[in-house]
Amino acid sequence: MKSYRKELWFEVPDRRAFINITPKVEACLKESGIQEGLVLVNAMHITASVFINDDESGLHHDFDLWLEKLAPHQPVSQYRHNVGEDNADAHLKRQLMGREVVVAVTEGKLDFGPWEQIFYGEFDGRRRKRVLVKIIGE
């Protein structure tokens, strides 16, 4: 069995963003040479997320509104975590959107369902963060 590891780095200038990272993950898969196996894509920071969904701007807008209703940034005084930083809402948003995804690799390609894409979700931007891509298989 082969194993491949790569870190993707992001520095998002805005507080929140959704970035389609499918092409970057596909490039990792091609570089790995693995034809059959699994890909793990994992946000390596507690205020960022990796998830699978549709790449549709209206849906991304809906995610943003929904997350802000569930865990609003303001007022920052509502959170006990906000001592030194004002990012408690980002931790909660990450919990909702998830930490990682696993995708099957079949015949050298990501084995997605219809419309599925991999996204990096940023909830406390303006600092450098990484995503781990780990691929195992043959």
Language model region names:
Residues 1-138:
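Active-site histidine-anchored catalytic micro-motif
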